[in-house]
C-alpha cells in the first residue's frame, strides 16, 4: 500500500515522503495513529502543491537573509557603543548578544534575533570588533561594532 507520511517515522520514512509499505502495517499502525495517509492521486496532488508553496516561502526567506547580509556588510552599518571604562581599559558592563541586537534595531531598524548572533563570550574591551551572525542556514555575515570610551 502506498502512503504519504504526515510525520517522521523512524526507519520507515520522513514527513512528506510517498512510500510503499505493507498493507497491514499501514492500516493497523500508520493510518490509525495518523502518522500517514493513503496516497491517492488527490492526496499526492495536494502534497505537491504544499511542497511548491513551501519551496517558494523558503526562497523568499533566503532572499530576505541575503538582503539583510548586504545591509550589515555595508560600510555605513557600524553599531556604536559608548561604555564606561575602568583604569585597566576594560568596560564596566559587558556587551552581550542581546545588547547588540537591541542597538542594531535602535540605530538601523534591523531586527535580528539575539540567538543568531554568534558571540563566544561577552565583549569587554573598547575598539572595533566584528561579530559573526547566522542569518539563514546558507547565509552568514558580520556585524561591525565600534565600542568607544564614555
From Swiss-Prot:
Keywords: Ribonucleoprotein, Ribosomal protein, RNA-binding, rRNA-binding. Pfam families: Ribosomal_L9_C (PF03948), Ribosomal_L9_N (PF01281). The keyword RNA-binding applies. GO terms for molecular function: rRNA binding; structural constituent of ribosome. One of its GO terms (cellular component) is ribonucleoprotein complex. PROSITE patterns: RIBOSOMAL_L9. GO terms for biological process: translation. It comes from the Bacteria. NCBIfam families: L9. This is Large ribosomal subunit protein bL9.
Amino acid at each position: 500500500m502506498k502512503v504519504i507520511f504526515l510525520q517522521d517515522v523512524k526507519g520507515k520514512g520522513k514527513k512528506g515522503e510517498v512510500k510503499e509499505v505493507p498493507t497491514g502495517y499501514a492500516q493497523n499502525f500508520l493510518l490509525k495513529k495518523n502518522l500517514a495517509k493513503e496516497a491517492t492521486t488527490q492526496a499526492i496532488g495536494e502534497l505537491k502543491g504544499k511542497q511548491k508553496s513551501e519551496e517558494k516561502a523558503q526562497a523568499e526567506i533566503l532572499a530576505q537573509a541575503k538582503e539583510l547580509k548586504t545591509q550589515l556588510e555595508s560600510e555605513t552599518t557600524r553599531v556604536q557603543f559608548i561604555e564606561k571604562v575602568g583604569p585597566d581599559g576594560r568596560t564596566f558592563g559587558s556587551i552581550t548578544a542581546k545588547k547588540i541586537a537591541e542597538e542594531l534595531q535602535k540605530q538601523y531598524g534591523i531586527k535580528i534575533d539575539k540567538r543568531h548572533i554568534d558571540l563566544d563570550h561577552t565583549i569587554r574591551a573598547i575598539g572595533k570588533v566584528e561579530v559573526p551572525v547566522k542569518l539563514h542556514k546558507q547565509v552568514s555575515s558580520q556585524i561591525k561594532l565600534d565600542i568607544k570610551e564614555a
